[in-house]
Swiss-Prot record:
Annotated Gene Ontology cellular component terms: extracellular space
Lineage per the UniProt record: Eukaryota, Metazoa, Chordata, Craniata, Vertebrata
Organism: Rattus norvegicus
Keyword terms of this UniProt record: Antibiotic, Antimicrobial, Defensin, Disulfide bond, Secreted, Signal
InterPro entries: Defensin_beta-like (IPR001855)
The protein, known as: Beta-defensin 10
Keyword Disulfide bond in annotation: yes
SUPFAM superfamilies linked to this entry: Defensin-like (SSF57392)
Amino acid sequence: MKTLCSLLLIGCLLFSYDTPVVGELKHLGMTAETEWCRLFEGFCHDKNCPPPTSHVGSCHPEKRSCCKDRR
């Protein structure tokens, strides 16, 4: 019984926290959003897009706006 409880405790401790791999996957998603914005000749802006630009999407971290010049 002690062995079973010990194995269960070890298993819970191993899977109870975010591993570094999960952090890396979040970073990849952030990079993909930013690269998507720059691919369409946009730029990330902290708040609303400035007047000569338009909102075309979002840059993932902090939900920033992806802005592009109107042409």
